[in-house]
UniProtKB/Swiss-Prot annotation:
It comes from Arabidopsis thaliana. Voltage-dependent rectifying anion channel that facilitates the translocation between chloroplast and cytoplasm of phosphorylated carbohydrates such as triosephosphate, 3-phosphoglycerate and inorganic phosphate (Pi) depending of ATP to triosephosphate ratio in the plastidial intermembrane space; in high triosephosphate/ATP conditions (e.g. photosynthesis), export of triosphosphate from chloroplast (outward rectifying channels), but in high ATP/triosephosphate conditions (e.g. dark phase), import of phosphosolutes (inward rectifying channels). This is Outer envelope pore protein 21A, chloroplastic. The chain crosses the membrane at residues 22-31, 56-65, 72-81, 88-97, 111-120, 128-137, 143-152, 159-167. One of its GO terms (cellular component) is pore complex. The lineage of its organism: Eukaryota, Viridiplantae, Streptophyta, Embryophyta, Tracheophyta.
């Protein structure tokens, strides 16, 4: 099980996130994840998703259900496509999108982004680094991510930020 501690400017409380991936076959897995809000002492959300991977095309698709304490049950569809900029995939250009629907299948929330990833393996001894710069198309806002081994810092030009530590 993958677990992490997360803190964001919009929540003002520490969250504990857990994710488990169950392989169905070589290209498909069931992914369960959820989050506990330590400030309120209750779960923030729970999600169950089937993810399908097209390894030869560096593409993945996912369909699932998401239960949020505020918006109740939602349907979720997401996808991501990677394009290597350099042959060893140290630098990639990624296109990703997702759309949430309410129970009546009316569109609720769409997100889409284009981004560049630069993975620097062995930046220092026992230290890997990833730099990501992207643009969220629906919110029209640039963003960036810095990831160093277990630490991840995300921010955008609207002043939002979050930090994650993978346990």
């Amino acid at each position: 099980m993958e677990t992490s501690l997360r803190y964001a400017t919009n929540s003002r409380s520490l969250k504990i996130h857990a994710k488990e991936k169950f392989p169905v076959n070589s290209k498909t897995r069931l992914q369960l994840h959820g989050e506990l809000d330590t400030g309120a002492g209750v779960p923030s959300y729970f999600c169950a998703m089937i993810r399908y991977f097209f390894h030869e095309a560096s593409t993945n698709l996912g369909v699932g259900l998401h239960y949020d304490k505020r918006e109740k049950l939602r349907c979720l569809v997401r996808g991501k496509k990677k394009f290597p900029v350099i042959t060893d995939e140290v630098v990639t250009f990624n296109i990703k999108g997702r759309c949430d629907f309410d129970q009546d299948l009316v569109q609720r929330n769409a997100k889409g982004a284009a981004e560049f990833d630069w993975n620097i393996w062995k930046f220092q001894k026992d230290q890997d680094l990833r730099l990501r710069i992207g643009y969220e198309m629906f919110e029209k806002v640039p963003y960036m991510q810095i990831r160093e081994n277990n630490w991840t810092f995300n921010t955008n030009l609207k002043g939002k930020w979050n930090v994650r530590y993978d346990l």
